[in-house]
Amino acid sequence: MHHAKKDDIEKIMNIFKANRKWFPHVREYHIKTRIERNQVILEDDVVITYHYYTRNQPLSKKDKEGNDIGKKVMAEKGDCILHQIVKDKESKSKASDVLQKFFKTVKSNKVYLSVRSENEVAIKFYLRNGMKLVGRTTWSEGKMPGNIYLYENHLYVKPPEEIKVKKVKVKKTKKVATLEAHLEF
């Protein structure tokens, strides 16, 4: 996978502008920041923005009355959140191929994303690519409903946590010169 570079910003922003209906909130400074953090992939005219959670993070939210809108979904530290995937409309490349490659290279067992409930094209795309609906969310103070999807990456093996070894003082003993002296009690 090719992480985007600063020189790619114009191309990336043009792809987002062509898809303004679904990404009206994406700003250039936001993409520049993500590029600096190696959180933007540009491959075959497909853009993916993502990051790894540094702490446990609730993904499901409440409706405008403050009620839970379904099962609570909690991402754990180290899980991946895919923020956006968008393709150049003029390109013949397949976003599905790029997404599958992303799934194979991401360093996480779980990849989450949320999408507006009305975005049927995206929802069908996510389902075709092995994601499962796991919860609901909202934006704009509960006015814009969304779905939470999860891809479980069984190819990634999480490294074991660092093992902390406690230092112990070793008691020095007298050296024994002969076998007979060693065997005496």
Give residue ranges: language-model regions:
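Conserved N-terminal entry element of GNAT/NAT acetyltransferase domains
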Residues: M1-D7, P160-I163, F185
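Short amphipathic alpha-helix that is part of the acyltransferase structural core
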Residues: M1-V26
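Conserved active-site tyrosine of GNAT-family acetyltransferases
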Residues: F16, Y126, M131
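Active-site rim helix/loop that mediates acceptor-substrate recognition in acyltransferases
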Residues: R20-V40, T49-H51
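Short hydrophobic/aromatic beta-strand element in the GNAT-like acyltransferase core
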Residues: R37-L42, V47, Q84, Y112, ...
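Conserved acyl-donor/pantetheine-binding loop and adjacent beta-alpha core of acyl/acetyltransferases
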Residues: T49-Q84, E90, S140-P145
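Conserved acetyl-CoA-binding loop-helix of GNAT-fold acetyltransferases
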Residues: S91-T105, K124, R128
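Conserved beta-strand-loop-alpha-helix junction that forms the acyl-donor binding cleft
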Residues: L113-I123, W139-M144
